């Protein structure tokens, strides 16, 4: 999949990196890995400027999918890099607490080699990747990694979530199909849990053009969205522009 070119804003408010401080190259980089050898790929804008701090999007994989399959499934690379994001795609590993903690190290590893604005780290993923997205956001050892999350088709329901304490208010965009037969109804349950954690009103507003409802009056002005699609469990929702819009509207991770 091709990377896009972005338009940089050069102003005094733009976070920067010292010239020569980040060795990562522009475009397509494959075969990066964590300390425990979780492979991941990195995509930057074609005209990547290593002195400008970029938002980072980490896209976690569904069960059985590798990083290349995740990139193909989501189709995020071209649009995200064209909008100035750096994107990382890790392989899937069977989820466990140690694996989730390892997956949560990827943003810091990317930031060692590429110029990343560490207040603008965003997580998304499909199925197990959505579960990883949720878990990294609420687990005690990994919360604070992300400025906003957008899990899709995640296998996390109200019973699971009841075992965990809430993180600080966090922008969340839950995507789930009403036709998901693997995790039926899980997305709506997860959205209600996040809305309660974010101290929103309990009744969401009307659906927008993407099928999303927003829980109003959340703490700290964060957004809490539930977006209900009609595809199968394995289908990535056709709303990449809306996901990227959501991420662009939110920065500054909450510890």
PLM features: residue spans?
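A domain-start/cap signature at the N-terminus of enzymes
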Residues: 1-54, 126-150, 156, 204-217, ...
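Short beta-strand element of the alpha/beta-hydrolase
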Residues: 51-63
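C-terminal catalytic histidine-bearing segment of alpha/beta-hydrolase fold enzymes
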Residues: 173-175, 182-188, 197-255
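Alpha/beta-hydrolase fold nucleophile elbow
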Residues: 115-127
């Amino acid at each position: 999949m091709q990377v896009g070119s972005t338009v940089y804003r050069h102003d005094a408010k733009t976070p920067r990196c010292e010239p020569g401080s980040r060795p990562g190259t522009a475009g397509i980089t494959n075969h990066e890995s964590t300390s425990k050898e979780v492979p991941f790929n990195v995509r930057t804008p074609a005209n990547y400027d290593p002195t400008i701090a970029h938002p980072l999007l980490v896209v976690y994989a569904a069960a059985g999918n590798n990083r290349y399959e995740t990139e193909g499934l989501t189709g995020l690379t071209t649009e995200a890099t064209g909008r100035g994001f750096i994107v990382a795609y890790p392989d899937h590993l069977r989820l466990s607490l140690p694996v989730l903690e390892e997956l949560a190290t990827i943003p810091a590893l990317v930031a060692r080699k590429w110029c990343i604005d560490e207040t603008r780290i965003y997580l998304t993923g499909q199925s197990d990747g959505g579960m990883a997205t949720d878990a990294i956001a609420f687990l005690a050892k990994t919360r604070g990694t992300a400025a906003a999350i957008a899990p899709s088709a995640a296998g996390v329901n109200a019973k699971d979530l009841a075992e965990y304490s809430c993180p600080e208010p966090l922008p969340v965009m839950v995507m789930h199909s009403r036709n998901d037969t693997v995790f039926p109804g899980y997305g709506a349950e997860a959205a209600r849990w996040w809305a309660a954690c974010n101290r929103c009103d309990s009744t969401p507003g009307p659906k927008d053009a993407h099928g999303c409802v927003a829980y109003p009056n959340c703490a700290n002005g964060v957004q809490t969205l539930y977006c209900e699609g009609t595809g199968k469990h394995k289908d990535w929702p056709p709303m990449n522009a809306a996901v990227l819009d959501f991420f662009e509207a939110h920065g500054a991770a909450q510890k």
